[in-house]
From Swiss-Prot:
Domain Glutamine amidotransferase type-1: 293-533
GO annotation, biological process: 'de novo' CTP biosynthetic process; pyrimidine nucleobase biosynthetic process
Binding site for UTP: S14, K188, S189, K190, P191, T192, Q193, K224
Active site location: C379 (nucleophile), H506, E508
UniProt key word Magnesium: yes
Keyword set includes rRNA processing: no
Binding site for ATP: S15, L16, G17, K18, G19, L20, D72
Gene that this sequence comes from: pyrG
Listed InterPro entries: Class_I_gatase-like, CTP_synthase, CTP_synthase_N, GATASE, GATase1_CTP_Synthase, P-loop_NTPase
Entry binding sites for CTP: S14, D149, I150, E151, K188, S189, K190, P191, T192, Q193, K224
Organism in which the protein naturally occurs: Chlamydia pneumoniae (Chlamydophila pneumoniae)
Catalyses which reaction(s): UTP + L-glutamine + ATP + H2O = CTP + L-glutamate + ADP + phosphate + 2 H(+); L-glutamine + H2O = L-glutamate + NH4(+); UTP + NH4(+) + ATP = CTP + ADP + phosphate + 2 H(+)
PANTHER family for the chain: CTP SYNTHASE (PTHR11550), CTP SYNTHASE-RELATED (PTHR11550:SF0)
Protein name: CTP synthase
C-alpha cells in the first residue's frame, strides 16, 4: 500500500476531542516532513450536515469544492495544511445512498444487498478514494461517535477488514476518558478497560491508547491500563485538559512523543518535528493580553460551536495584533441588544438562516452605522447591512429580504437565479470557492494587500438584488467586490463610516492561527482604533 493509515476511535464518552487530536497529529506529522491527508467518517444517516440544526450539530464547515461538512474539518484546516475536499468527509447517509443507487441500477446482479459486504466495501472504497485524491504519506481517519454505538459498527467492521488486508501499514489509536473522582482523590481506569474490551470484541486491537483526563496520569495508572488493555506501556499516552487554549494540544502530544511511536510502528522516514513557531503563538495566547471586545450578534450564540470558525478567526486576528479577543455573545432577540453593543469595540453579525432574530440584527446594524462602531457582516450579516441601509438611508421602509418577507415591495435581497428554497434544501446552495474582483482604493482592497482578485468560500442562496445597486451606491453604499463574469455583489462598504463592511462569503473558513485572515485583521484593527477614541465610553 503506497500510504500509511492511522485510525482514530473514541470510547467512554462523546466530545472527547478526537477532531482536535486528529488535527494535532496532522500538524506534528507535517512538521516531520510528511504529507498528511484527513478523512472524517460520521455515522449519522444525514447525507451531510448541511440541513442540521446548529444547536444540535454545531457549525457547517464548507470546503473549496463546495461540500458541507462536520466542524472537525475546520479543526483540520486551522491546525494543518492538509488539503480538504469532498473526499475528506463521508457519512452513513452518503454511503447507504450510493449502495442503494447501485442496487437500483442493477450493479449487484441480483445479490442480496447487506451491510457486510456491500456497506463495508463502500466504506473501504471511501478510504481508498481519499488516499488516491491526495496521495499522502499518511492518511488520518477519524471515526465519529463512541465505541458501543450501534451506528458505528459498519465503520468499525470496515476498519477491521482494512487492517486485516494492510496490517503493516495501519495503526489504531483509541482515545478514552479517564475520570477523576474528587471524593476519592483518584482517577479510574475501569471505563477505559471496558471501552477497549468492547473494541477488541469487534475485532480491533488498538496499537495505542490516548487517555484524556483532568489531571496527569501517574506511571502506575498507565501501567495498569497497559496491562489490562494489552498494549505496551510506551503506547499509553495522556493528554490533560488544556489550561488556556486548544492550540496547546499539539505541544502536549509532542511532549508525549506519540509521533515517535507512530513513526516506529509504521516505519516512517521522518525528521524531528519543529514546533517552535507554534509554541511562540501558544505562549502568547497564554499571556494576559489587552482585550478587544467583539460583540457577536446571532441566534445561536448560546452554543459556541455554532460559530466555531468565527470565534477562532477573531482569536487569530486579535493575537496577530497583540490582543486577546473577548467575544461577547449577544442574542439577536435580546431587547437590550444595543445597550450590550455600546459596551463593545466592534460588532460582527455572522451567517445564518430564517426570520428569527432578523429584526434584532437589523437593529444592531443600524446602531453600529449611526454610532460609528466597526461592523463586519458575513453572509446573512451582509444582507442585514444592505436591508438596514435601504430602510433607513434610502427611506424604503418596507425593504426586506425575500427570505424574510416573500411579499415585500422592495426585495433588496432576492433568490439567486437557479435557486428555489421550496424545491430542495440539502446541498443545493451556492457552495464552495468563487473568485472576487476587488475595487482599487477600497478598504477591502487594502486589507487584501491590494490584490485585485481573491477567492473565498460561499454558502448561500440569496444575493443583493442588482436592481437596487445603483440607488444604494448613489446613497453611499459602495459595491467593492464582485464575482465575475456575472458581477454578483460580494463585498460592500459604507462610505462615510470608519469600518462597516459586509461580505457574501465566509472568510472565517480559511483563517489559521499561523495565518489569520486579512479581513479579520482589518476588522480588529478598526475595533482597536474605535476603542482608543476618546468619545467611546
Amino acid at each position: 500500500m503506497p500510504f500509511k493509515c492511522i485510525f482514530l476511535t473514541g470510547g467512554v464518552v462523546s466530545s472527547l476531542g478526537k477532531g482536535l487530536t486528529a488535527a494535532s497529529l496532522a500538524l506534528i506529522l507535517e512538521r516531520q516532513r510528511l504529507n498528511v491527508a484527513m478523512l472524517k467518517l460520521d455515522p449519522y444517516l444525514n447525507v451531510d450536515p448541511g440541513t442540521m440544526n446548529p444547536f444540535e450539530h454545531g457549525e457547517i464547515y464548507v470546503t473549496d469544492d463546495g461540500v458541507e461538512t462536520d466542524l472537525d474539518l475546520g479543526h483540520y484546516h486551522r491546525f494543518s495544511s492538509a488539503a480538504l475536499s469532498r473526499h475528506s468527509s463521508a457519512t452513513s447517509g452518503q454511503i447507504y445512498a450510493r449502495v442503494i443507487k447501485r442496487e437500483r441500477e442493477g450493479d449487484y446482479l441480483g445479490s442480496t444487498v447487506q451491510v457486510i459486504p456491500h456497506i463495508t466495501n463502500e466504506i473501504i472504497q471511501v478510504i481508498l478514494d481519499a488516499a488516491k485524491e491526495h496521495s499522502p504519506d499518511v492518511l488520518i481517519v477519524e471515526i465519529g461517535g463512541t465505541i458501543g454505538d450501534i451506528e458505528s459498527l459498519p465503520f468499525l467492521e470496515a476498519i477491521r477488514q482494512f487492517r486485516y488486508d494492510h496490517s503493516e501499514d495501519c495503526l489504531n489509536i483509541h482515545m478514552t476518558y479517564v475520570p477523576y473522582l474528587q471524593a476519592a482523590d483518584e482517577v479510574k481506569s475501569k471505563p477505559t478497560q471496558h471501552s477497549v474490551q468492547t473494541l477488541r470484541g469487534i475485532g480491533i486491537i488498538p496499537d495505542a491508547i490516548l487517555c484524556r483526563s483532568e489531571k496527569p496520569l501517574t506511571q502506575e495508572v498507565k501501567s495498569k491500563i497497559s496491562l489490562f488493555c494489552n498494549v505496551p506501556n510506551r503506547a499509553v499516552f495522556n493528554v490533560i485538559d488544556v489550561k488556556h487554549t486548544i492550540y496547546e494540544m499539539p505541544l502536549m502530544l509532542a511532549q508525549e512523543k506519540i509521533a515517535n511511536f507512530i513513526g516506529e510502528k509504521l516505519k516512517l522516514a521522518t525528521v524531528p518535528e519543529n514546533l517552535d513557531d507554534w509554541r511562540v503563538l501558544v505562549n502568547q495566547l497564554s499571556q494576559d493580553l489587552p482585550k478587544v471586545k467583539i460583540g457577536v450578534v446571532g441566534k445561536y450564540v448560546q452554543h459556541r460551536d455554532a460559530y466555531k470558525s468565527i470565534f477562532e478567526a477573531l482569536t487569530h486576528a486579535a493575537l496577530r495584533l497583540g490582543h486577546a479577543a473577548e467575544i461577547i455573545p449577544i442574542d439577536a432577540e435580546d431587547e437590550n441588544l444595543t445597550m450590550e453593543l455600546s459596551q463593545c469595540d466592534a460588532c460582527l453579525v455572522p451567517g445564518g438562516f430564517g426570520v428569527r432574530g432578523w429584526e434584532g440584527k437589523i437593529a444592531a446594524a443600524k446602531f453600529c452605522r449611526e454610532q460609528g462602531i466597526p461592523y463586519f457582516g458575513i453572509c446573512l450579516g451582509m444582507q442585514v447591512l444592505v436591508v438596514e441601509y435601504a430602510r433607513n438611508v434610502l427611506n424604503l421602509d418596507q425593504a426586506n429580504s425575500l427570505e424574510m418577507d416573500p411579499n415585500t415591495p422592495h426585495p433588496i435581497v432576492y433568490v439567486m437565479e437557479g435557486q428555489d428554497p421550496l424545491v430542495a434544501t440539502g446541498g443545493t446552495m451556492r457552495l464552495g470557492a468563487y473568485p472576487c474582483l476587488l475595487k482599487p482604493g477600497s478598504k477591502a482592497h487594502k486589507a487584501y494587500n491590494e490584490s485585485s482578485l481573491i477567492q473565498e468560500r460561499h454558502r448561500h442562496r440569496y444575493e443583493v438584488n442588482p436592481d437596487y445597486i445603483q440607488s444604494l451606491e448613489d446613497h453611499g453604499l459602495r459595491i467593492v467586490g464582485t464575482c465575475p463574469p456575472q458581477g454578483l455583489c460580494e463585498i460592500i462598504e459604507v462610505s462615510d463610516h470608519p469600518w462597516m463592511i459586509g461580505v457574501q462569503f465566509h472568510p472565517e473558513f480559511v483563517s489559521k492561527l499561523i495565518s489569520p485572515h486579512p479581513l479579520f485583521i482589518a476588522f480588529i484593527e478598526a475595533a482597536l482604533v474605535y476603542s482608543k477614541d476618546a468619545s467611546h465610553v
